[in-house]
């Protein structure tokens, strides 16, 4: 059961306290539980949506979107920014690409990729809520 808790701790900000430091094998097995953690996150977001369904669609979409980012700690957005920066900045140079990915700062392409993905996620959440409410 440790791999599940490792996955939940890694992919969310939920206060999961592991009794020991995970082994490489346990970390590898944790990947198998990523879909389940995604289902849990989706379930929480769905539950919040159902509870506050009477709110205006725009407000509810903003709440759900913010909760989604908060629950995951923005982990995927950080990875997206690193990848976008490295892909554009290190184009054709593998060593430069890896250097850019390790750099803690975020370049303009990284910021732009986050903005675009966040706008799309927010718009899609809004459309889903609006269609359900009508």
Pin down the residues of each PLM region:
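Hydrophobic alpha-helical transmembrane segments
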Residues: 1-73, 89-96, 103-134
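Juxtamembrane membrane-interface segments at transmembrane alpha-helix termini
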Residues: 73-79
């Amino acid at each position: 059961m440790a791999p599940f808790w490792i996955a939940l701790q890694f992919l969310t900000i939920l206060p999961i306290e592991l009794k020991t430091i995970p082994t490489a094998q346990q970390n590898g097995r944790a990947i198998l539980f990523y879909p389940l953690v995604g289902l849990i996150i989706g379930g929480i977001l769905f539950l919040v949506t159902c509870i506050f369904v009477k709110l205006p669609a725009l407000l509810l979409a903003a709440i759900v979107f913010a909760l989604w980012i908060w629950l995951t700690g923005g982990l995927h957005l950080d990875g997206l920014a690193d990848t976008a920066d490295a892909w554009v900045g290190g184009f054709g140079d593998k060593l430069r690409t890896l250097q850019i990915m390790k750099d803690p700062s975020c370049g303009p392409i990284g910021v732009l990729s986050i903005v675009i993905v966040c706008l799309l996620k927010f718009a899609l959440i809004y459309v889903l809520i609006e269609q359900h409410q009508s």
